[in-house]
Amino acid sequence: MAEDEVKVPEDMFKDVKFYPVGDLDPKVVQMLKAGKAKEVSYNALATHIIAEDGDNPEVGEAREVFDLPVVKPSWVILSVRCGVRLPENGFSPESGQIFFGVTACLSQVSPDDRNSLWALTTFYGGDCQLSLNKKCTHLIVPEPKGNKYEYAFQRGSIKIVTPDWVLDSVSEKTKKDEALYHPRLIVYEEEEEEEEEEAENEEQESQNGSDEDKYSSKSSPVTSRDGSPVHNRESSPKRSSSDKIKSELMFDDSSDSSPEKQERNLNWTPAEVPQMSTAKRQLHQGAPGSERPDMMAFRSPAVRTLRNITNSADVQQVNRPSNVAHILQTLSASTKSLEQRVNHPQQGHPNAVLFGQVKPLTSEAQHLIQQSHQPHHQQQQQQQNHPIVQLQPQQLLQLQQQQQQITQQVFPQHQFPQVNQQHPFTQLQFPQQQLHPQQQLHRPQQQTIQHFQQQHALQQQLHQLQQQHLQPKPQTLQQNMQQQNLQQPNLQQILQHQQTIQQTPSQQQALQPAIQQQQMLQPNIQQQQTLQSNLQQQTLQPIIQQQQGLQQQNLQQSLQQIQQQMQHLTPQQKQQIQQQQQQMLQKQQLQSQSLQQQQMQTHVLQQQQIQTQALQQQQQIQNQALQQPQQNQVQTHALQQHRLQSQTLQQQHHVQGQTVQQQTHQLQTQTLQQQHQIQTLQIPHQIPAPNQQHQIPPQMLQQQTLQLQQQMQPQIQQPQMQSGVQQQSSLQPQQMQQHKHNLQQVQHQLQQLQQQRMQQRQMALPQQIANQQPPQPHQLHGHDPSVEIPEDFFLLGCVFAIADYPEQMPDKQLLATWKRIIQTHGGTVDAALSSRCTHLLCESQVSSMYAQALKERKRCITAHWLNAVLKKKKMVPPYRALHFPVAFPPGGKPCSQHIISVTGFVDSDRDDLKLMGYLAGAKYTGYLCRSNTVLICKEPSGLKYEKAKEWRIPCVNALWLCDILLGNLEALRQIQHSRYTVFNLQDPLAPSPHLVTDDLLDAWRMPLKVSSEVLMSIRMPLKPKQNEPAVQPKRPRIEDIPPPTKKLSPDQTPHVIFTGFDPLQVQQYIKKLYILGGEVADTAQKCTHLVANKVTRTVKFLTAISVAKHIVTPEWLDESFKSQKFAEEQNYILRDAEAEVLFCFSLEESLKKAHVNPLFKGKYFYITPGICPSLSTMKAIVECAGGKILTKQPSFRKIMEHKQNKRLAEIILISCENDLHLCREYFAGSVDVHNAEFVLTGVLTQALDYESYKFT
């Protein structure tokens, strides 16, 4: 259908006021007008900007300044075709769009995929077409074949990408590198290999059918036409479906099971991998015939995905098929405790596709795998000989068949005889072997790979310990575990480098047979495991909660199956099981009693040695860390808190007996000593905490912790076996509730102790520092609290010296005013810093006088502090960052690149923030625009805050600016730090305590004493006044002046305004004026006479000079009153020779020029909002001189149009230093921008000076 034949719905564009930019098709304008749209000639009045060229300056100006929607003409055409107004954000012509300048040709994709890709590309600024011609910049093709592909491949101007490129670019909101998405990166396998694995994967596919339905919602319409999820494609790399196309599926991050990826995959464009063949995806390592080997070898998306999988992306429980994970957990229940306890990204079993991708392993890798599997093989043999349970032969046979089936599914290419499950640590070694050494050099994950290599060495040591503890006789298991607990400090020292609190692999493998027996025998173990999981969640990190959901679900399913099997047992079998359980308990009790006596004697000797070593190490720590006492206390508390968490875990999983308590005490004490030695030598950078005198010694906290531990042990009533080998009897529901209640009480006591300790210490955590308040009033003092100081003399006893300010003050009269105010309120000012000085007024900490003042314990403050105490009428310690000298030299500008704005602060707080920004060198704007770099918020709300979030402007608290003033220049680079995003602070302008040095506060810790003689000298003159009756001096007041009684004709009635006089004088002049029949002008525009003593650049003078007929002296009114009629003005014209010489003008000549022709007649002014004087003042001055003010910023094109066309009025731009960012476009186009003096001096001299006041 032709565009001119389309009928525009009535009132479709009724609310649209459009401003066309550039040359538009007349048909577009006709459509808009047919829909009742209105065309405006000025963009500030428009609601929509219609432009084809996104680089036009008017487009950026409309978007940045006026925040107007800018759309292409196609928005109008397509809206008319669709019969409804389409959203504007899909038709932006600006170059900031993701696919701006992209013309893509789609080939070899299905109609549904083509529609999706077409919509995404065009919505984000690109164009799509089906024909491949010279206009095309990109060819989107899923596989490297076809005529279009061959044509584009021969021409380097056309970039060839897969559909992944579109989806990933939209997802990450930036155009991705096309080289990573070339279809030739796909490598095909031979047909024979596909046939070999077809049968195995069909079997696995049938078992994973339920998982396909479960996860199919995560696949996108582009990536899955048949509904199969991406992660299932990876778990079965070869599919036997005959309806698949023969392209290859590239690796991408869409299979990443991390929460960020899952959230991204749930968007309306979740697809990240195009629908292509299910051929196995491998790393490209130099395919034959590759014309671009450098690109493919080092930039392959497969490397990126494999890297993510290695770094914990896909090696998780969630990617395992549910039935496989269920049976694996049934067979190896001992791994449950490890999975619940350890928050490690490398959990679960690796996906089967990884084994399909593994190249032949190196000899070193095979040696590591064999070494890690050897002790596990011993465990399996031990498990076969262990009397697990008396099950029926059919059940045992079925269980063995399930084990073999799982082993074949999970390990199709790497099977080991007599191994039913893989060791959890061994599983982590396979993905790491897939990275090529050359690729490691080009990957940012080299550090991660080095971390895996370090784990190899650590695991070899762990396996050596494991071989020592694994014995073929079950009755010696308990003794071996107790010996291992004695060796635990060395093992914990190794595990501390891994930063985990997990059990050793030797403990897990040694406990597997007994734990499996326990799970097969106990009907109530499901409740107990749930209870233990809930208790562990309180002490472990919250991240474990994300993984425990699926783990608990699979575990419950396995336990239910076990219970169903237990129901089929005969009563004789159940009775036999109970008898075996009782016998095991009796044997363990005897062994515990015999070992207890031996360990008691050993413990006494070890305790004495530990105390001796602790004292020595404590003394050594104090000597080594003498310069950092606060850091050692922070580190001590961190160790103690870690020990409390370890005690909680051990109390949940070990027996309550005296033996375990002694071993735990011994183990923790030795671990604490080793950690102290390590951390004393490697003390991290900590912010020193003040108030260190309130720190509790570490030994005292250790005693409190031990006492609490002794109190906790009797409360735990749950029978447990030592070292995790538990043969628990079933607990009644009431006993379990009581047990849970007791544990909660103990944990509550632990939390209270930790909270008390955290309140006493002051660590450099972001939110704690942000909420810390300035030094408390009881610590810092002004005057002696016991002496009452009169409010009028609140500076009594203060002797000031002034530094920095005299050099920076051009007006010496201001400094004299300061001295007069100090003396008026009882203080004195010395010319130089002397011994009797008590205060130093200075701006910066970088001066010799400041250093001397600190050395002599003087109170160093700024003039802003003096202003604050003048308002309070009391000498108080400095309480805001503005009251302390800045940490950089005077005139230093660390924030010179920042343009700040403020929201939520009012009155004095807002004024202080302006001053702080000025001291830091930042530009301040009362408004918020896209050019602002920082928004300082009091609370996260308001229109400015919402706009700042929309425009991605950092929002910080006032603490950010306080830290910069006090020397923490790292805040400039760490503007997104969490300490600066804590809002609603009690005193947001208070300084950070760690930045206010003790030297700066030492003088304020001693109150300033005033001698009684000085106080008596102040109070003596007051006593006579107290005896006399209180006689208040008469305060002159302005009387209500009656209106004029004498009436004159309107032409003869003068309308007068006064400027530069005292209010009482003005009152007398108004009386005389009313008697003579004159009137006081309401506004400057209505005045005929201006009465002034001298030329002053006040608002009244600068406005009246353009409209008043006469500017006269007060003598004119006096003489008129004497003669009872208005005298001739020519004899009383104001003449100010000094001002006329200063500004190079003649007042009389200026008045004549203004009467003949107003200075700004026929001229438009745009004044930026941050101008000084205020915008309202400037508006009044300009309008009195005949000019007009533009409320919206004109575009560059509009200014040039008015400049070139003489018939149009001239547009003059007035701005200030803080608003120059709004004029960047004008500077780029060589348009002059002037400061306020162009207007102020111009109206005074009645001359236009285009050269003297423009910004360069």
Curated annotation (Swiss-Prot):
Subcellular location: Nucleus
One CC-aspect GO term: nucleus
Pfam families: BRCT, BRCT_2, PTCB-BRCT, RTT107_BRCT_5
GO process annotations (BP): DNA repair; positive regulation of transcription initiation by RNA polymerase II
Stored PANTHER family: PAX TRANSCRIPTION ACTIVATION DOMAIN INTERACTING PROTEIN (PTHR23196), PAX-INTERACTING PROTEIN 1 (PTHR23196:SF1)
Subunit description: Interacts with smad2 via its last three BRCT domain-containing regions in an activin signal-dependent manner.
Sequence ranges of Polar residues compositional bias: 217-226
Motif placement: Nuclear localization signal: 857-874
Compositional bias annotation for Acidic residues: 188-205
Gene responsible for this protein: paxip1
DNA repair among keywords: yes
SUPFAM superfamilies noted in UniProt: BRCT domain
Principal subcellular localisation of the protein: nucleus
Keywords assigned: DNA damage, DNA repair, Nucleus, Repeat, Transcription, Transcription regulation
Classification via CDD domains: BRCT_PAXIP1_rpt1 (cd17714), BRCT_PAXIP1_rpt2 (cd17710), BRCT_PAXIP1_rpt3 (cd17711), BRCT_PAXIP1_rpt4 (cd17730), BRCT_PAXIP1_rpt5 (cd17712), BRCT_PAXIP1_rpt6 (cd18440)
InterPro entries attached to this UniProt entry: BRCT_dom, BRCT_dom_sf, DDR_Transcriptional_Reg
Biased composition (Low complexity): 701-773
Chain's role: Involved in DNA damage response. Promotes ubiquitination of PCNA following UV irradiation and may regulate recruitment of polymerase eta and rad51 to chromatin after DNA damage. May function as transcriptional cofactor in TGF beta signaling. Accentuates smad2-dependent transcription.
Official protein name in the record: PAX-interacting protein 1
Annotated region described as Disordered, given as residue ranges: 184-295, 366-387, 701-782, 1025-1049
Compositional bias annotation for Basic and acidic residues: 231-249
Domain BRCT stretches: 8-93, 94-183, 794-883, 890-978, 1053-1134, 1155-1196
